[in-house]
């Protein structure tokens, strides 16, 4: 009996290839995306790159999201196949094949289909991963510290995921066969989908989850918190999107149906009825396209923004060839560092230029009614503002100014943030509970251009010009920084030897609190990180976009076969071709552009959150905004091209 069922299963797959080819495309697509995402997360070189571990964790979370999308896409595709084959299974029952044998037949078909589709998907995934790796590394044109490596562990992870999904598919199919009578299966194809229970409750839950995710993305001000909560917000948006496209679309179509004046127009009647007929499957496909589109937009926008901000970040963090910075919290510790730096400079292979020394105190402020409060604030408190306090003598010497301040006065230079936020500030509370009056507001950007930027992020950043910054030094809530910067005219070929000599001198002293930096060496590290980010971002964006295109194509093909018979009946009832074509256009427009519009809404609400995260890398928010707008415009154009191509396939099937 088994041999007979096996033969029947293979014959059935061939006979129903019009149904299984789109299903295979969907399965291959999700397998490729799963493999690429997991293989990138498992890249061993990430462990040695700046920010590599964070990137690997992000990709690991992305793999979970792709698993969810894969589950929904395969369940959606399987539901279409089962609905169109229900009549066939019903005939088997009438002809005497019992339910257990029909279930076994279904299992054999599913095993053969899954083995071929998953196997092909893994092969294509490995090829795509390797080929795109080679092409992108060629385009980057410099060593980013990452090499292609085959990830056997990713093969196992994808196999486990896909096996789990198809086991679930089999049990759902088996339950359907077991619970349905042969006569019910014969009529299954012509039955519309049930609305499901508690539509209103599900819609409210979906709105609640989405609203909370949106609120979270807009209310978080700290970049560090944005990074921590970003993944939770993404997960909530994914769940809410599937719920709302399901329950929300059902509720919306029901409301439209109750509007008799709108519903009983021929064009609206046809398109709304068709959408209602398969509303739940429609929702799954539309939600998947929406999520994949959002992933493309956010991934590419962040990647491009980080790439464009690389040079600016390098120049702001390292304005000179070399720099040394010593951190201390006790004034008695400051005198040990100048002699060490002088010994380091003596190893220069060329001539020293532009030697500068900065003595600053860093303080963080929380917003008060009249300004900012320095008391009880440290760098871990997500401060509203960061103040770099510098002596008035040092500032005047640097810029040729002649400012004067008293013991309890400060001139505030605005570097970053909203000027209006402190235009009326009169007092500041400091460690000695002294009231410091803001004497004047000036532009602080000239100071920021010559001063190495600090590795802290705050929405508002200022330089505070005071008489003696050391009086603000506090072991708990503030620290002093001794900066030494200089350039050299050393030939390029001697720079490596010069840097090695510098490091050798530093290692001879117990100066753990002092760091030494080379702009050339930092550039290598930064470009390696950004290059790897570009590689990962491009690979994921391509994979997600291919996934979205294939889901769209699958929807058009599968729904074209479902709609063909219904439109033939409409023609027989006397409805003219013009009305039918108009209703088809309206239906296709809804199916195509609802996910696109929703993806842009998701991206708009996510913007503040990923802008904050990108600021951790020193990239200005305007760069992120410009990148998002440009990527969004390009995506719309490409999406329209996909719409034109795939909609033709739908029209061709309808006209057969």
Mark where each language-model region is:
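Basic-flanked hydrophobic alpha-helices used for secretion and membrane insertion
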Residues: 314, 320-546
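Hydrophobic alpha-helical segments
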Residues: 109-256
């Amino acid at each position: 009996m088994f041999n007979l069922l096996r033969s029947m299963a293979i014959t059935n797959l061939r006979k129903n290839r019009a149904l299984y080819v789109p299903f295979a495309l969907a399965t291959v697509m999700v397998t490729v995306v799963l493999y690429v995402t997991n293989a990138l997360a498992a890249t061993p070189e990430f462990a040695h790159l700046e920010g590599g571990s964070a990137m690997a964790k992000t990709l690991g979370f992305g793999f979970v999201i792709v698993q969810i999308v894969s589950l929904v896409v395969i369940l959606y595709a399987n539901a279409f196949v089962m609905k169109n084959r229900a009549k066939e299974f019903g005939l088997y029952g009438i002809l005497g094949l019992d339910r257990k044998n029909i279930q076994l037949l279904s299992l054999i078909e599913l095993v053969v289909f899954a083995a071929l589709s998953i196997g092909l998907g893994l092969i294509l995934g490995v090829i795509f991963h390797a080929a795109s790796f080679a092409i992108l590394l060629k385009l980057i044109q410099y060593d980013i510290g990452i090499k292609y490596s085959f990830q056997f562990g990713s093969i196992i992870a994808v196999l486990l995921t896909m096996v789990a999904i198809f086991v679930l598919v089999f049990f759902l199919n088996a339950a359907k066969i077991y619970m349905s009578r042969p006569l019910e299966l014969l009529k299954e194809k012509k039955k519309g989908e049930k609305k499901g229970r508690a539509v209103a409750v599900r819609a409210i839950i979906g709105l609640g989850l989405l609203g909370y995710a949106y609120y979270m993305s807009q209310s978080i001000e700290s970049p560090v918190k944005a990074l921590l909560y970003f993944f939770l917000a993404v997960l909530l948006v994914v769940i809410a999107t599937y719920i709302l496209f399901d329950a929300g679309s059902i509720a919306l179509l029901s409301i439209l149906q109750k509007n008799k004046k709108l519903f009983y127009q021929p064009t609206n009647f046809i398109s709304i009825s068709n959408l209602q007929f398969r509303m739940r499957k429609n929702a799954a496909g539309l939600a998947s396209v929406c999520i994949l589109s959002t992933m493309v937009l956010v991934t590419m926008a962040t990647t491009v923004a980080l790439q464009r901000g690389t040079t600016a970040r390098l120049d702001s963090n390292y304005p000179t060839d070399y720099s040394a910075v010593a951190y201390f919290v006790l004034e008695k510790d400051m005198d040990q560092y100048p002699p060490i730096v002088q010994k380091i400079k003596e190893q220069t292979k060329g001539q020293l230029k532009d030697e500068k020394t900065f003595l600053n105190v860093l303080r963080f402020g929380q917003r008060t009614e009249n300004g900012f409060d320095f008391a009880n604030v440290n760098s871990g408190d997500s401060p509203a503002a960061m103040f770099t306090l510098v002596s008035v003598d040092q500032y005047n010497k640097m810029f040729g100014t002649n400012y004067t301040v008293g013991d309890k006065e400060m001139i505030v230079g605005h570097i970053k943030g909203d000027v209006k936020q402190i235009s009326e500030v009169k007092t500041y509370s400091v460690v000695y509970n002294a009231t410091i009056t803001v004497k004047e507001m000036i532009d602080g950007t000239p100071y920021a251009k010559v001063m190495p930027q600090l590795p802290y992020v705050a929405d508002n950043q200022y330089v505070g010009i005071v008489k003696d910054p050391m009086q603000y030094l506090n072991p708990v809530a503030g620290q002093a920084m001794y900066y030494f910067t200089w350039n050299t005219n050393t030939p390029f070929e001697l720079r490596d030897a010069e840097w090695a000599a510098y490091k050798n001198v530093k290692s001879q002293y117990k100066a753990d609190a002092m760091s030494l930096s080379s702009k050339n060496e930092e550039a290598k590290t930064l470009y390696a990180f950004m290059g790897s980010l570009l590689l990962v971002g491009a690979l994921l964006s391509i994979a997600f976009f291919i996934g979205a295109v294939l889901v769209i194509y699958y929807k058009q093909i599968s729904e074209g076969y479902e709609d063909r018979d219904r439109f033939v009946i409409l023609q027989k009832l006397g409805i003219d071709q013009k009305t039918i074509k108009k209703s088809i256009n309206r239906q296709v427009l809804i199916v195509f552009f609802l996910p696109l519009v929703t993806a842009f809404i998701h991206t708009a609400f996510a913007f503040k959150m990923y802008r904050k995260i990108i600021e951790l890398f020193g990239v200005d928010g305007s760069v992120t905004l410009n990148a998002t707008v440009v990527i969004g415009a390009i995506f719309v154009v490409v999406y329209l091209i996909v719409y034109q191509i795939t909609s033709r396939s739908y029209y061709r099937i309808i006209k057969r």
